């Protein structure tokens, strides 16, 4: 027997997630994301498009990344997480911060790049994220998480991105400049 309990807050969050799922496009996302983050996302799109040689796939990966970040923010800002999820969220934030510092460090310090280490860090973030959103988002959202992390944690992609003589050197420089700004601004 279904209960007839009306919860406007829950309904509002559900509507936000539904609307967000329908409206996320580059132009909408840039109004909800700061300039530095937008620059990093744009650079991630460019390097992904070049690497995959597939504009549509690159757009899908970045759109999925934006949707996940914004849905996570909606859940967080609307206090939807229980104590365990809040603890996981704190671990996730620390892991993302570590990831950001590692991405920059591997670029700045010659001969330190370790694709397996970076891939593992990314996959650790993926697992934490799945645990955080487990009871809140659909299987489709979990698929989006996997789509994003499957691409960015791919060791071949990482090796190509960090190749000091490869075609992505300028992209990596711009990405690291943006991530460094995000670290300086306390946004990551």
Curated annotation (Swiss-Prot):
<comment type="function">
    <text>Acts as a negative mediator of apoptosis.</text>
</comment>
<dbReference type="InterPro" id="IPR038355">
    <property type="entry name" value="TNFAIP8_sf"/>
</dbReference>
<keyword id="KW-0963">Cytoplasm</keyword>
<dbReference type="Pfam" id="PF05527">
    <property type="entry name" value="DUF758"/>
</dbReference>
<dbReference type="InterPro" id="IPR008477">
    <property type="entry name" value="TNFAIP8-like"/>
</dbReference>
<dbReference type="GO" id="GO:0043065">
    <property type="term" value="P:positive regulation of apoptotic process"/>
</dbReference>
<keyword id="KW-0175">Coiled coil</keyword>
<protein>
    <recommendedName>
        <fullName>Tumor necrosis factor alpha-induced protein 8</fullName>
    </recommendedName>
</protein>
<comment type="similarity">
    <text>Belongs to the TNFAIP8 family.</text>
</comment>
<dbReference type="GO" id="GO:0043027">
    <property type="term" value="F:cysteine-type endopeptidase inhibitor activity involved in apoptotic process"/>
</dbReference>
<dbReference type="GO" id="GO:0005737">
    <property type="term" value="C:cytoplasm"/>
</dbReference>
<keyword id="KW-0053">Apoptosis</keyword>
<feature type="coiled-coil region">
    <location>
        <begin position="39"/>
        <end position="72"/>
    </location>
</feature>
<dbReference type="GO" id="GO:0006915">
    <property type="term" value="P:apoptotic process"/>
</dbReference>
């Amino acid at each position: 027997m279904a209960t007839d309990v009306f919860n406007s807050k829950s309904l509002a969050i559900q509507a936000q997630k539904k609307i967000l799922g329908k409206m996320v496009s580059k132009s909408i996302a840039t109004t909800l994301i700061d300039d530095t983050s937008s620059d990093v996302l744009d650079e991630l799109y460019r390097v992904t498009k070049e690497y995959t040689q597939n504009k549509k796939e690159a757009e899908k990966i970045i759109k999925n990344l934006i949707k996940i970040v914004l849905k996570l923010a909606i859940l967080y800002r609307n206090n939807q997480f229980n104590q365990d999820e809040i603890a996981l969220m704190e671990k996730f934030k620390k892991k993302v911060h570590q990831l950001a510092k590692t991405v920059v460090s591997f670029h700045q310090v010659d001969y330190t790049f370790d694709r397996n280490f970076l891939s593992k860090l990314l996959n650790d973030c993926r697992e934490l994220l799945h645990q955080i959103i487990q009871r809140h988002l659909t299987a489709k959202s979990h698929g989006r998480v996997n789509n994003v992390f499957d691409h960015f944690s791919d060791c071949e992609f990482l090796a190509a991105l960090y190749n000091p003589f490869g075609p992505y050197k300028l992209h990596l420089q711009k990405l690291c400049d943006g991530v460094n700004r995000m670290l300086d601004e306390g946004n990551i």
